[in-house]
């Protein structure tokens, strides 16, 4: 136990040292503490966006879904999250441009600027806070489960240990400490997950043989709709729909748009995103699929611990402990960003500290960490079920307000408020089973109704004093690209290939390889798009020579 614990504590101390390094600079002002001086460049932006988005769910939830559902869950995450990066172009680049000119710090600063209503800004912030705080608890839950399974630390002690260290380095170094720890944590998550994948499959007889054995016992893990029959086409489509509109509304991702150094940095993140999601999610789902053969009788709640269970069986004490730190890195890199962003929402939008502001803001971080831990004391049944029913749906409701505010001059504050209230009412109705949507995810009818309310109220009302001057005109040359990305979305919902006997190629169904290739193609189209767009912005005609003086 002590050998394992010493490895984990060493890693935690390293994260703390990074916070100490950036302590002095982070304590200067709000822009430095919350946004790292608006200077997060290409490499750091990509890794911090990836690490922030790839939470405990990436390791524990994805491997658990692979155990319960099978490979049917891989494309909705690998391709679906990669396609979601298109929203970084749709929303992120415009927010980045406006924030440089208009001094945004929080996501809701845009709402106040565009719609001219402080009360709407507070409503928008409140929704972000309410639906993100449970997600902080998810990271604490996962850390407690992981340390309990691997080291034997009591669940609550493990959750408290990780939460405390995250709170410490965030309060010390602000966003600068977060983006640098994200660089380390994302690298660890990728490398250590790959190492775990290799070790587990080698000890299981090799990649192809292991899959053949799993297929002989659990063929439904290689099919669609999956082992439990849950991945119906409507559910599949719903997940792709959900990621696209919900993920950019996570306040910690939204605030990365504001902190980015320039548009090139954000473009690089977009191009690389499908590659990392295609690769990393394949590893974690595959580990879960193999785990079904190794531990066939786990309950849904127990299945979220399949990753550390396999490491315990197939790796030695030192190696398994080292590799599990990759999963700790995944959850810590999300928790730190959520704590910092929620603190900015509370202190900038509600509390308004005037003296010793950064010191008091650090106190809010401590309070939020404590609250997240308290929620984790009674964890929900499964990570997947919890976040799909609360956080994602609740945040997706905000998308029409943001997109409409960016691109439609008729949108107004009353439409935004009405759509948010109506949408969140539907979220509660679905969560408490007042309403149901058989065969599809609730987010589809919720977001459709929210958008209808937003459009209708915008057309029927006017709101004087709104800042329509920042609304971006739609460029005529964008429509061919709308068709291109719509086509890729259709290819990502390959309904014509469902319910067929899987053809195994190198141990995997052919349709899994199809989605690996589609992720690469998506990245290539992102690259072509940003290059063509950059070329189109270049001034035409010969440049005028400048005479030397």
Q: How would you label these PLM feature ranges?
A:
Residues 1-509, 519, 527-534, 541-549:
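Membrane-embedded helix-loop-helix hairpins and adjacent transmembrane boundary segments
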Residues 512-513:
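Membrane-embedded, hydrophobic transmembrane alpha-helices
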Residues 522:
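A short, polar/charged loop-to-alpha-helix boundary motif
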């Amino acid at each position: 136990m002590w050998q394992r614990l010493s490895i984990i504590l060493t890693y935690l101390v390293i994260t703390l040292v990074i916070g100490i390094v950036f302590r002095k600079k982070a304590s200067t002002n709000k822009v430095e503490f919350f946004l790292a001086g608006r200077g997060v460049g290409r490499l750091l932006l990509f890794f911090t966006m990836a690490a922030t988005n790839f939470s405990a769910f990436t390791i524990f939830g994805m491997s658990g879904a692979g155990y319960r559902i099978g490979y049917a869950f891989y494309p909705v995450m690998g391709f679906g999250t990669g396609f979601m990066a298109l929203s970084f172009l749709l929303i992120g680049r415009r927010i980045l441009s406006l924030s440089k000119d208009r001094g945004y710090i929080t996501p809701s600063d845009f709402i106040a600027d565009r719609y001219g209503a402080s009360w709407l800004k507070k409503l928008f912030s409140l929704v972000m806070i309410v639906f993100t705080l449970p997600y902080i608890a998810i990271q604490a839950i996962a850390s407690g489960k992981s340390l309990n399974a691997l080291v034997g630390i009591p669940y609550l002690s493990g959750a408290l240990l990780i939460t405390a260290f995250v709170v410490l380095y965030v309060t010390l170094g602000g966003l600068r400490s977060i983006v640098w720890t994200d660089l380390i944590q994302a690298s660890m998550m990728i490398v250590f997950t790959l190492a775990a994948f290799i070790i587990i499959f080698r000890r299981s007889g090799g990649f192809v043989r292991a899959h053949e054995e799993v297929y002989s016992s659990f063929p439904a893990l290689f099919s669609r709709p999956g082992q439990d029959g849950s991945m119906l086409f409507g559910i599949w489509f719903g997940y792709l729909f959900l990621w696209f509109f919900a993920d950019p509304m996570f306040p910690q991702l939204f605030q990365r748009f504001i902190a980015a150094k320039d548009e090139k940095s954000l473009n690089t993140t977009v191009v690389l995103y499908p590659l990392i999601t295609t690769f990393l999610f394949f590893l974690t789902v595959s580990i879960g699929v193999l785990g079904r053969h190794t531990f066939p009788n786990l309950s849904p709640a127990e299945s979220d611990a399949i990753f550390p269970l396999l490491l315990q069986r197939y790796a030695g004490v030192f190696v398994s402990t080292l590799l599990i730190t990759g999963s700790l890195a995944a959850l810590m890199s999300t928790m730190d960003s959520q704590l910092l962003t929620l603190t900015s929402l509370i202190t900038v939008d509600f509390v308004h500290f005037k003296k010793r502001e950064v010191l008091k803001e650090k106190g809010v971080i401590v309070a939020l960490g404590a609250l997240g831990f308290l929620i984790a004391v009674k964890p929900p049944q499964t990570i997947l079920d919890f976040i799909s029913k609360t956080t994602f749906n609740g945040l997706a409701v905000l998308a029409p307000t943001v997109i409409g505010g960016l691109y439609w001059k008729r949108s107004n504050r009353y439409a935004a408020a009405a759509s948010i209230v109506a949408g969140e009412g539907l979220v509660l109705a679905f969560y408490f089973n007042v309403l149901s949507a058989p065969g599809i995810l609730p987010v589809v009818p919720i977001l459709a109704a929210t958008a209808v309310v937003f459009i209708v109220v915008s057309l029927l009302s006017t709101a004087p004093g709104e800042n329509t001057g920042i609304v971006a005109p739609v460029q005529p040359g964008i429509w061919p690209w709308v068709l291109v990305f719509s086509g890729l979305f259709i290819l990502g919902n390959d309904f014509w290939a469902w319910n067929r006997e899987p053809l195994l190629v190198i141990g995997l169904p052919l349709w899994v390889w199809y989605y690996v290739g589609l992720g690469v193609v998506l990245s290539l189209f992102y690259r072509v798009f940003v290059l063509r767009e950059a070329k189109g912005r270049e001034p035409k005609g010969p440049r005028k020579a400048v005479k030397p003086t």
